[in-house]
Amino acid sequence: MAQANLSEILFKPKFKHPETSTLVRRTHCNHVVNIHSALDGDTANHWYRMINRLMWTWRGIDPLEIEEVLSRIACSKAEHSNNELLDTVVGYRNGNWIYEWANQGMMWQQKAMEETDPGSAGQFWLNAANLYSIASYPHLKGDELSEQAEVLSNRAYEEAAKYLPYTLKELTFPISDGGSLSGFLHMPTVGSAPFPTVLMCGGLDTLQSDYHRLFRDYLEPKGIAMLTIDLPSVGASSRWKLTQDTSYLHQQVLQALADVPWVDHQRVSVFGFRFGANVAVRLGYLEPQRVRAVACLGPIVHHLLCNSDSLRKVPDMYMDVMASRLGMADSTDETLNTEMNRYSLKTQGLLGRRCQTPMLAGFWENDPFSPKEEAKLICSSSADGKLLAIPSKPLYENFHRALLQTSEWLEDKMR
């Protein structure tokens, strides 16, 4: 990897790149909907993006570093596409969201290249990968600068694995439409292959490299491997649009695991965050012979997709993410809402029907996107359901405890 010049090559100015918040051409409300969510972060006055301090800190970024980068963005006097929103600086320059986070990532990349201690070098590369991922956030289709930051994130993630005490393999899976899909298999130092494996289904605004901490702290010590696959229209899966068959890609990966020698294909479970739970639960119904168990936190499987009042409270950024994933960047909210109804697993005739696959669903009280009833619907549909209530405070500690309980439950179901 030609690390020294990669960022210069990728971000070499060619033309005036469109600013992220202008890519989806729905009518933005521009009023602040006060949202506080454990998994999604907070809305903030005069910011287009949700500011997700918990998850960014959980991934390993210093909270002070987060505030430092945000302050650089907030102080910019450069041209904005929307003068009311701080993170809408036009062009790849000081104050632009992608520029500032990528610049921070490049600093850690340089430190990693100069570091002689393998453990420190690996951590520095991981820091760079996390910062490049935030630069790319929320990963809207057609955002060229964002896509270039994704390339840097994936390359840094692969570099980190060369120094850290686990094995990372990039696997390629054939897809029925003639394409191929790449995913990362993380293999533990505990035990020996073939490993029980968790197939990770992240949210619509995350990359597969964002879940390293889940593997390192919760799965790896138990001798469990983790396979990450991006959701359709995100990252390595960007060529596929998200359709009502949300598990289209993950199902084909699941069916191919019998041919992967490092994976015990008879001991595979699925873990879904947010909309990733839609994929995970769907797999529990469609592939009960291949899936030992399904776990999900803050699931989006029915309520938000079918409740117009709830959808009206969703911040602009998240509605833009949905429109981008569905290939509906020019649609009205009414058309988008109608289409989203079809993504409900209850509307599809799955949830509510008895399923033999064990399912765990965790929820936070007053979660704006996923009420307790959502998790209860999942658990009551399973012949072996477990409901996990996660207290909101203290936020970080309870998130950690929820992941511990979930990983222990998955370990038990894969024995």
UniProtKB/Swiss-Prot annotation:
Top-tier EC class: hydrolase
Keyword Hydrolase attributed: yes
Keywords, in A-Z order: Hydrolase, Serine esterase
Gene Ontology molecular-function annotations: carboxylesterase activity; hydrolase activity
Pfam assignment, any one: FrsA-like
EC number, UniProt record: 3.1.1.1
Organism domain of life: Bacteria
Cysteines paired by S-S bonds: none
Catalytic activity: a carboxylic ester + H2O = an alcohol + a carboxylate + H(+)
Family under the similarity heading: Belongs to the FrsA family.
NCBIfam families per record: PRK05077.1
Job description of the protein: Catalyzes the hydrolysis of esters.
Protein name: Esterase FrsA
Biological source species: Yersinia pestis
